[in-house]
A protein has these predicted regions:
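Binding-site signature for planar aromatic cofactors or substrates
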Residues: 1-133
Length: 133
């Protein structure tokens, strides 16, 4: 699926869910905002020190599902691999200030987690086996 992620996410509204699993395969899902598009193959999410971030310390794979606010089931799925993260960085707060009012919350670390986009699939269909599609 050939999608310009920057254009896509700027043009649609909807709900995102980020799925992670820990090193033993225990799965978690969490509602997440749209990703920050770094470049054609890289996205980033701002995370608090919670279960999703914890899981990514032992398993660098994640999946992001985005359902558009339209009738039916329209959206995309991103298969992701964690590249790196930054804790309370200037880049994190400059990105965050573009979307959200307010700055750094004292005593609550934030992480800017970068992912390589391995594959993009539609929300429904086309993807029985992510290794073969």
């Amino acid at each position: 699926m050939d999608v310009n992620l920057k254009e896509y996410f700027e043009s649609v509204k909807g709900t995102g869910v980020l799925a992670t699993a820990d090193g033993e395969g225990r799965v978690d899902t969490a509602i997440y905002a749209k990703p920050h598009i770094i470049d054609k193959e890289t996205v980033a999410f701002i995370m608090a020190e919670r279960l999703t971030h914890h899981n990514l310390q032992t398993n660098n794979h994640a999946a992001y599902l985005f359902k558009e606010d339209v009738p039916g089931y329209k959206g995309i799925r991103l298969f992701l691999t964690k590249l790196r993260e930054e804790k309370d960085s200037e880049l994190l707060y400059s990105i965050r200030s573009k979307r959200y009012a307010g700055g750094k919350e004292e005593g609550k670390p934030r992480f800017l987690v970068f992912f390589k986009v391995e594959k993009i699939l539609p929300l429904v269909g086309a993807g029985r086996d992510p290794e073969k599609d």
